[in-house]
């Protein structure tokens, strides 16, 4: 039954399933937790929707190539991390969230100061939504301690090269 609460929850569940960052059990646990706190949606309907959406995604995945753009993106971000980048995927829901996550990651107490010496790059959920709509994936980037705009431009070039290196078209 599509009322506002059900429609909102349906949209979030669909996004989380297609983003691919959470196991089905984690999404189900999150749905249960939202219901337990009284979020006002129809729990059986949302659970049925989640099951059907997972089946739909599995059918789509069966048609995907062995190496997907997501796999290539993982490799590019791992490569950048190896070069001293703070490379974060799904860094919140907005650009501001992403910058905050980068700052938290770089400045965490258990992170050696020499770990993130080069730059940072990230994307957030709105960027993933655009990618799922075939509008491309935006990746934010910059130098961790820029002396000039050229430092940030150089980081952009490194991100571009890493994406190109794994076969993505930046």
Model segments located where?
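Acidic, proline/glycine-rich low-complexity IDRs
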Residues: 1, 134, 138-170
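N-terminal leader/presequence regions that precede the main folded/catalytic core
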Residues: 1-35
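An N-terminal amphipathic alpha-helical segment
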Residues: 100-138
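Structured alpha/beta or helical-core interaction and ligand-binding surfaces enriched in interleaved
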Residues: 57-114
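Short glycine-rich, low-complexity/disordered patches
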Residues: 25-33, 47, 87-96, 162-170
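A short, surface-exposed helix-loop junction/capping segment
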Residues: 52-61, 138-144
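Repeat-associated, polar segments at repeat-unit boundaries in modular proteins
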Residues: 33-58
